[in-house]
Amino acid sequence: MAKSKKKTDVVDSTNLPILELLSLKAPIFQSLLHPELPIIITGFGTGHIVCHRYDPAKLQSHLDRRRRIDTATTGKDAKKGVCPWIRLDIDLETGDLKFVDIEEQQQQKQTGKDEDLGVKTLWKTKRHKGSVRAMCFDSKGDNIFSVGSDNVLKKANTMTGKVVKKVNLSSLFNSEEKKNDKFTKLCASQTHPFILIGDESGNIHVINSENLALSNSIRSIHFGDSINDIFHFDKRSAYKFISLGQTTLAYFDVRDKDAKPNVAGNEDGKILISDDQEDEVLCGCFVDPEVADTLLCGMGEGIVTVWKPNKNDLEDQMSRIKISKDESIDCIVPTLQDDNCVWCGCSNGNIYKVNAKLGKVVEIRNHSELDEVSFVDLDFEYRVVSGGLENIKIWELSSDDVEENASVESDSDEPLSHSDEDLSDDTSSDDETTLVGLSKEELLDELDKDLKEDHQEEKESNSKSVKKRKIMKENNKKKDLYEHGIKKFDDL
């Protein structure tokens, strides 16, 4: 009995989204979070791309405010069925954001300004004919690359949306068959000016990110099946990448010309192909990209496979972690919190936090009761972001993340200006009792004052910890470059 209770305590999550963006008229195909700014870019099945900037502190303040109102208001006055976080519908025709909830719509009419929502539209455009198939940022987030079902690759400025370069990918190939291939994945090098584009025939093309010229092609990697995922293996080399497709994992160097898979009859092939997993390999990531000693892959039958490149050079999985039977793990991203964990998006509408070291699920959050989770990402402060065809949710930081931010700050020379220990349970209880006796207007005023003070301190704490992590990341990147002896982009 005790064991069952412990298991329940581990996986239950009380975290809520701070923002939900919905598309009630067009399917969402892709979403990206800027690495250094509170910016989210969304691609749609209609070919539209929309860029939004959000204010995490304001959105968190709104969520906390609704929580306190629910706690402080008596039962007879409590509002049933009111969503505590902000939910906005994206209008692709005008670019406007509209509240989904009726009560919030009435408040928006009084203010009439998008910035009061904590979210505003920076730009929108009809970028592609047909659907948006894939998107990615460059290493600094200054530009965004997108490819559509029209086979046109476009490079645009992130802040303005203005296209600075474009190319019809079909014009780069001589074969008629290759001209008709559709593209599935984009991946940008973090150290050199090139991007990789995977297609439905198992080919990966290397494109110069400056002039969008074709540099190399690695063909038929997964026996002609579609490329499901591509990611960097820069711990080995700036030119090493991993791709997933069909039931195999492949490991290759983008500089190799006419590279062939190392299969039976061609053992000298330069593309290293894993053993057949007898289950479709849909997505993958390193638990810690800077260490790159553990790789997790999401599978079609609801499990995550664990790979150790230092043990068997990615020939086969080492173990597996059960997530959800008869469901598929469609997307995966590391938490980047030094906790040996990743976030997995599942076809049942849940996102799972999986501890690779313990080999089990440690947290579950529900993204949707009706829609599957088709992509997960992290924002600039490491909030997890989940998305499906109908909506995108930016989740609040968990208590573990907040504690880590505090521990990072306490290691610095600056003294802590605020601590959770300063607030006793008795004080919190007294505040709640006092608030119950106030009118609704007085209650809201008091809550607003408290939240402004709380989130100013939280914002300062988060900014310091994020800045420190980014400095550490840049130092590690420079170290990797020095170790590999890479100084310039010679071979591509």
From Swiss-Prot:
It is found in: Nucleus, Nucleolus. Keywords: Nucleus, Repeat, WD repeat. Residues 404-472 are annotated as: Disordered. Interacts with BUD27 and GIS1. WD repeats lie at residues 127-166, 178-217, 236-274, 276-317, 365-405. One of its GO terms (cellular component) is nucleus. Its main location: nucleus. It comes from Saccharomyces cerevisiae (strain ATCC 204508 / S288c). This is WD repeat-containing protein JIP5. Present with 7750 molecules/cell in log phase SD medium. Residues 449-462 have a biased composition (Basic and acidic residues). The gene is JIP5. Residues 404-414, 422-433 have a biased composition (Acidic residues). One of its GO terms (biological process) is ribosomal large subunit biogenesis.
